[in-house]
């Protein structure tokens, strides 16, 4: 049984860059993809593979062999259409687990309907975690 997983992270904004770095530091195989060559260059030392490319192009994804990855993370949260196309392509190419970033509840619903296994709204989740910790300072931070 393999102890590490392979991840494809699409989008190298703050969220995508941080997720990919942490997954790589945990010993996983991580490929990142973004259309911005500067962001790809910055990430290249913190991941297994860094690629300049457009995840909205299914043929680009197919050529990279993304169907071999255990999990695809769509970290394009600002553009509904870009994240929808990337999610749809990853789903159609057979990635077994797809996690997406959304910017609001409507975006989240659309991504779930497309077949995303999990959708996070980072600002909402972080705000809830902060409010809980401020309201209950004696609770362990891991709760």
Q: How should each PLM-predicted stretch be described?
A:
Residues 1-143:
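Cytosolic regulatory regions of ion transport systems
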């Amino acid at each position: 049984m393999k102890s590490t997983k392979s991840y494809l992270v699409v989008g190298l904004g703050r969220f995508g860059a941080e997720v990919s770095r942490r997954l790589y530091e945990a010993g996983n195989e991580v490929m990142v993809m973004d259309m911005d060559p500067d962001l790809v260059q910055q990430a290249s030392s913190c991941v297994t593979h860094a690629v300049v490319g457009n995840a909205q192009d299914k043929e680009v994804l197919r050529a990279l062999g993304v169907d071999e990855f255990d999990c695809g993370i769509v970290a394009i949260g600002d553009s509904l259409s870009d994240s929808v196309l990337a999610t749809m392509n990853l789903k159609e190419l057979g990635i077994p687990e797809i996690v997406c970033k959304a910017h609001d509840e409507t975006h989240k619903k659309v991504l779930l309907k497309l077949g995303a296994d999990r959708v996070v709204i980072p600002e909402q989740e972080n705000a809830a975690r902060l409010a809980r910790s401020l309201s209950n300072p004696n609770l362990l931070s891991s709760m």
